[in-house]
C-alpha cells in the first residue's frame, strides 16, 4: 500500500530539530539524492539583457512531498522550488513587476526509517527533516542555473521546514 504525505511551504530561516523527540534507536537513513527536473524560461530574450537590474527580486514557492515505496519503510521525498525573477520587488503602486525568468527545480531523495518510530513522527521526519538535507543541493542547482542563464545569483536563505509544516497543518484544520 502506498501512502502519500504532502505539504506546501514558503521560506524563513531554520530552527527546531524534530528528531530530538524520537527514541534513540530510531533514525532517518539518507539514501540517494538526485535532480528530478530542471527548467528555466527566460522571458523576452535577448531584450531582457539590455537593461538588466543589478539585483533582480526573486519570488519563490516551495513544495515538499513524500511517498512510500512499496511495503518497506522507504520513502521518496521531493522538494520542488518554483521561482520567478522580477525586474524589481512588487510595490503597492506597481504590484506586477516585469518577469525576467521562471525557474522550476525538483530535487528528490530516498529516505529510510529504522527503529520504532511512532506513527505521528513519520510525517514530520519526511516533511521537515528530509527536506533539510535536500535544500542545500537544490538551492545550489537553482543558483547555478540562474547564473548560467545570465542573471545575477539571488540570495536565498535557508527555509524553516518545521515552522512551515506546522503552519500548513494549522491551515488544514
UniProtKB/Swiss-Prot annotation:
Primary role:
One of the proteins required for the normal export of preproteins out of the cell cytoplasm. It is a molecular chaperone that binds to a subset of precursor proteins, maintaining them in a translocation-competent state. It also specifically binds to its receptor SecA.
Keywords attached to this entry: Chaperone, Cytoplasm, Protein transport, Translocation, Transport
Q: For this UniProt entry, which residues form the secretion signal? A: none
Predominant location category: cytoplasm
An example GO CC term for this entry is: cytoplasm
Q: Please give the PANTHER family that the UniProt record associates with this protein.
A: PROTEIN-EXPORT PROTEIN SECB, PTHR36918
Q: Spell out the molecular function terms from Gene Ontology.
A: unfolded protein binding
Family as reported in the entry's similarity comment: Belongs to the SecB family.
Q: What protein name applies here?
A: Protein-export protein SecB 2
Quaternary structure note: Homotetramer, a dimer of dimers. One homotetramer interacts with 1 SecA dimer.
Question: Which Pfam families does the UniProt entry name for this protein?
Answer: SecB (PF02556)
Matching InterPro entries, A to Z?
A: SecB (IPR003708), SecB-like_sf (IPR035958)
Q: Coiled-coil ranges per the record?
A: none
Question: What highest taxon heads this organism's lineage?
Answer: Bacteria
One Gene Ontology term from the biological process aspect of the record = protein folding
Q: Where in the cell is it found?
A: Cytoplasm
Amino acid at each position: 500500500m502506498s501512502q502519500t504525505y504532502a505539504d506546501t511551504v514558503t521560506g524563513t530561516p531554520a530552527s527546531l530539530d524534530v528528531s530530538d523527540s524520537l527514541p534513540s534507536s530510531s533514525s532517518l537513513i539518507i539514501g540517494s539524492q538526485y535532480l528530478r527536473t530542471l527548467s528555466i524560461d527566460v522571458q523576452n530574450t535577448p531584450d531582457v539583457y539590455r537593461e538588466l537590474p543589478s539585483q533582480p527580486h526573486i519570488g519563490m514557492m516551495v513544495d515538499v512531498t513524500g511517498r512510500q515505496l512499496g511495503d518497506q519503510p522507504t520513502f521518496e521525498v521531493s522538494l520542488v522550488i518554483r521561482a520567478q525573477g522580477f525586474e524589481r520587488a512588487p510595490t503597492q503602486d506597481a504590484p506586477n513587476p516585469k518577469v525576467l525568468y521562471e525557474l522550476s527545480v525538483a530535487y528528490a531523495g530516498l529516505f529510510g526509517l529504522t527503529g520504532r518510530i511512532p506513527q505521528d513522527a513519520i510525517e514530520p521526519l519526511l516533511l521537515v527533516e528530509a527536506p533539510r538535507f535536500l535544500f542545500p543541493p537544490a538551492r545550489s542547482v537553482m543558483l547555478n542555473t540562474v547564473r548560467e542563464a545570465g542573471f545575477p545569483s539571488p540570495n536565498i536563505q535557508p527555509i524553516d521546514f518545521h515552522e512551515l509544516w506546522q503552519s500548513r497543518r494549522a491551515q488544514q484544520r
